[in-house]
Amino acid sequence: MILVDFWATWCGPCKMAMKQMKPMKKDLEGKDIVYVFIAGENSPKETWDNIIPDIHGEHYRVTAAQWKYLSKQFSIQGVPTYIIVDKEGAVIQKHTGFPGVDTVKKELMKALEK
């Protein structure tokens, strides 16, 4: 399963959510979950490079064209946006805005049970 986090370095709520989810990620360590973080090139590279070492997961900084494509494919209206993708590759949950750690953890646990 994959939790995709569309975010930006200049997005205060994005960074706050990452900090709040850190203990949850530790609790779920060893579970079959991959964390993917996607930021656009409107996030300055130097700032992005300084932030990502503290965030466990796979990190991608995409071009404006790639961001536009992903935004269209996943109907991204703003950041942060969270998408949970199941083992078959289906999007099973999407949130624009941080829904809270409890909600994210509950949805991940439910998806793991399938």
PLM features per residue range, with description:
Residues I55, V62-L112:
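Thiol/disulfide oxidoreductase modules built on the thioredoxin-like
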Residues M1-K15, M21:
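Short active-site neighborhood of thiol/selenol oxidoreductases, capturing the structured segment around
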